[in-house]
From Swiss-Prot:
Transmembrane stretches, start-end: 145-165, 182-202
Binding site for Zn(2+) 1: C71, C74, H97, C100
Keywords: Cytoplasmic vesicle, Endocytosis, Endosome, Membrane, Metal-binding, Phosphoprotein, Transferase, Transmembrane, Transmembrane helix, Ubl conjugation pathway, Zinc, Zinc-finger
Lineage of producing organism: Eukaryota, Metazoa, Chordata, Craniata, Vertebrata
Name of the protein in question: E3 ubiquitin-protein ligase MARCHF3
Organism encoding this protein: Bos taurus (Bovine)
General function of this protein: E3 ubiquitin-protein ligase which may be involved in endosomal trafficking. E3 ubiquitin ligases accept ubiquitin from an E2 ubiquitin-conjugating enzyme in the form of a thioester and then directly transfer the ubiquitin to targeted substrates.
InterPro entries hit by this protein: Znf_RING (IPR001841), Znf_RING-CH (IPR011016), Znf_RING/FYVE/PHD (IPR013083)
Pfam families given in the database record: RINGv
Amino acid sequence: MTTSRCSHLPEVLPDCTGSAAPVVKTVEDCGSLVNGQPQYVMQVSAKDGQLLSTVVRTLATQSPFNDRPMCRICHEGSSQEDLLSPCECTGTLGTIHRSCLEHWLSSSNTSYCELCHFRFAVERKPRPLVEWLRNPGPQHEKRTLFGDMVCFLFITPLATISGWLCLRGAVDHLHFSSRLEAVGLIALTVALFTIYLFWTLVSFRYHCRLYNEWRRTNQRVILLIPKSVNIPSNQQSLLGLHSAKRNSKETIV
């Protein structure tokens, strides 16, 4: 442990895709008081100096339960949801909520821990098509999807009626021996439907590609872990007492 002055804000764990490396934990005094208690910042960094996590904590000097285990993502305790220890991380970074971890794995599109690179057993379920239609992604993709749907609903009946009128006129011209006009109307019908089918195919393939990409990166992640990784409440109390004793020995400069 090392101590120094600092001014940091808590941040979410970043996505570290490099190889696993030894981590270094440092405790730094922030020089601020919360409810009359000093604060310190715990930083976890790799051996190459890359910052992995920063957590602002309050030094537990009055009550041993102020430093009970908390989720490393939302920094909340186990009052609303049980804490898990599903990977090989230890200490304050070893506990996490199931919902927080599932949301993180879904957002980052990964299946492993960013710190210890432990690979989780997960089940990925694709989200329904209706959800993509309601929220397809960025604003320009929403406008493109809405515009193509309006054009399709407007052009489809228009092209059908126009083609039927052209064919009907070509038949009438054939009855009156006006073959040139009949051939012109038939060619116009073929060109009209060719352009319509080409535009429909291109638009359909474009939106299918966007949907497949959205479906691949926006899956619902279900964490498959045994119940034994849950941290019981009595063990959480023991961890809190142990952390309080450990923090009382730390020197804040």
